[in-house]
Swiss-Prot record:
Places the protein is found: Cytoplasm
Highest rank taxon of the organism: Bacteria
Gene behind the chain: miaB
Name of the protein: tRNA-2-methylthio-N(6)-dimethylallyladenosine synthase
Cofactor: [4Fe-4S] cluster
Record domain MTTase N-terminal: where: 66-184
Assembly: Monomer.
GO CC terms: cytosol
């Protein structure tokens, strides 16, 4: 139902609702659906930086006595967005809850990268429908990347009318106003901005832990790979100022955090949008080496923008870890061209050579898509051979999932699903084989582990990660949680290592 249809419906029903408040004044401001056409546009306007986030007096104690629940799907960027929304809720006076049954507001922070992720969200909306019947005052919201898609918003409006609000990735800072509109409106509040995006600083955050932290360094993507919806849902590439990033990380270090992950849809493009200074990811990492914090890592990289200066800086080590996630997607130059990745197999292998030369202990992981439209057996074999040649430690592997609105979704696909599944199975067998081979090399070695907490499988066992992002399980006192320790590896598994504590916590210098 579009805006005009809703207004007409309201007028038609006005005779039966004379005693109710007239909500039509809200519709002009709260029905702003997404447009993939607008989201694709890239202009030359300067990125707007907002630094004055604050709550007007009208929102003071707005959420007192109420509870919120956020379910997060997808990538680390979504996890960080959830931390920001939790911060806004808390500032409003809301309290968190871990149960939808106990919540006054339920938000689903969604992922649009694959069809399976969207199916999970609509499945959850189905479960929430009965909860809404039992608790009509419950506010249900859908936010994140799915909200930026026209087809998703249309489906919500048509088949999920128990949803009270829909907002996107560009206007999280407007959550207080969206909540207020949803409370008063009798229709679904839709406020999705299909724009290039701004940078909003000084937003409150409730971080998930006190050991590791996400820090956004940039937003958006301008690469427009033919299979990917992200440039449409996250806007253009726009970088935070380095002084803001460094200040945030120094503050986290002062508060005891041990590890920072720098976030961006394409972190290697950091600084390319600056007009007043030549400053890239390598320059930022070089400055962050001087910050008194144990570990700094970043994700996600694009091979096209991974330059020599960054490699040189990473080779200096220190608090810059030796793990690099470098999505290749395919080992075939022809496939990479159709994907619009803008690099060849040879370019990727040369980049890997440079990284390994500068960082001999570098651990590389990757993302791979199989079954892309018209992928041949020979092209798939090129992916298998590249995987062996690089010697990745592990990979995230996927069957291609068409995303409406992307160029690849319109491509003719002559690869049968059974062939795609067989290729994925073969690739995963190779991934598993190399993973256990790589992990077996750690047996007998002493590694540095940042202790995250109890093992998910055994509360008597502690779990943490090495600098190269290897999961290590070992028995020790829970007082070591949050500390850096030395562990001797005694057993190697496909996805983890087991070990024994060999000394007390490491002093971070």
């Amino acid at each position: 139902m579009n805006e005009q249809q809703r207004l007409a419906s309201q007028q038609a029903n006005s005779s039966t609702k004379k005693e109710e408040k007239d909500y039509s004044k809200y519709f002009e401001s709260v029905y702003q659906p997404p447009s993939l056409k607008d989201a694709k546009k890239r202009g030359k306007e300067e990125v707007k930086i907002e630094r004055d986030f604050g709550l007007p007096e009208e929102f003071r104690n707005f959420g007192t006595g109420r509870k919120f629940y956020i379910r997060t799907y997808g990538c680390q960027m979504n996890e960080h967005d959830t931390e920001v929304m939790a911060g806004i809720f808390t500032t409003l006076g809301y309290e968190p809850t871990f149960s939808t049954e106990d919540a006054d507001v339920v938000l689903l922070n969604t992922c649009a990268i694959r069809e399976n992720a969207e199916n999970k969200v609509f499945g959850e909306l189905g479960h929430l429908k009965s909860l809404k019947r039992r608790n009509p005052d419950l506010l249900i919201g859908v936010c994140g990347c799915m909200s930026q898609e026209e087809s998703v918003v249309n489906k919500i409006m048509q088949k999920n009318q128990h949803v009270d609000m829909v907002f996107g990735t560009h206007n999280i800072h407007r959550l207080p106003y969206i909540l207020k509109d949803a409370m008063f409106s009798k229709e679904t509040v839709v406020e999705v901005w299909s724009k290039e995006g701004d940078v909003i600083e000084n937003l409150p955050k409730v971080r998930r832990g006190d050991i590791k932290a996400w820090v956004n360094i940039m937003y958006g993507c301008d690469k427009f790979c033919t299979y990917c919806i992200v440039p449409y849902t996250r806007g253009k590439e726009r970088s935070r100022r380095p002084e803001d990033i460094i200040q945030e990380i120094r503050h986290l270090a002062a508060n005891g955090y041990k590890e920072i992950t720098l976030l961006g849809q394409n972190v290697n493009a950091y600084g390319k949008d600056f007009e007043d200074v030549e400053y890239g990811l390598g320059d930022l990492m070089d400055e962050l080496r001087k910050v008194d914090i144990a570990r700094i890592r970043f994700t996600t990289s694009h091979p096209r923008d991974f330059d020599d200066h960054l490699i040189e800086v990473l080779g200096k080590g220190g608090n810059l870890v030796e793990h690099i996630h470098l999505p290749v997607q395919s080992g075939s130059t022809d496939m990479l061209k159709i994907m619009a990745r803008k690099y060849s197999r040879e370019h990727y292998l040369e980049l890997v050579r440079k990284i390994k030369e500068a960082i001999p202990d570098a651990v590389l992981t990757t993302d791979i898509i199989v079954g892309f439209p018209n992928e041949t057996d020979e092209q798939f074999e090129e992916t298998m051979s590249l995987y062996r040649e690089v010697g990745f430690d592990t990979a995230f592997t996927f069957i291609y999932s068409p995303r409406e609105g992307t160029p690849a979704a319109k491509m003719k696909d002559n690869v049968p699903m059974e062939v795609k599944k067989e290729r994925l199975q073969r690739l995963n067998t190779l991934v598993n084989t190399l993973a256990i081979e790589k992990n077996s090399r750690y047996k007998g070695q002493i590694v540095e582990v940042l202790v995250d907490g109890e093992s998910k499988n055994n509360p008597e066992v502690l779990a943490g990660y090495t600098r190269t992002n290897k999961l290590v399980n070992f028995v020790a006192s829970k007082s070591l949680i949050g500390q850096l320790v030395k562990v001797k590896v005694t057993e190697a598994k496909t996805w983890s290592l087991n070990g024994e504590l060999v000394e007390e916590p490491i002093e971070v210098k």
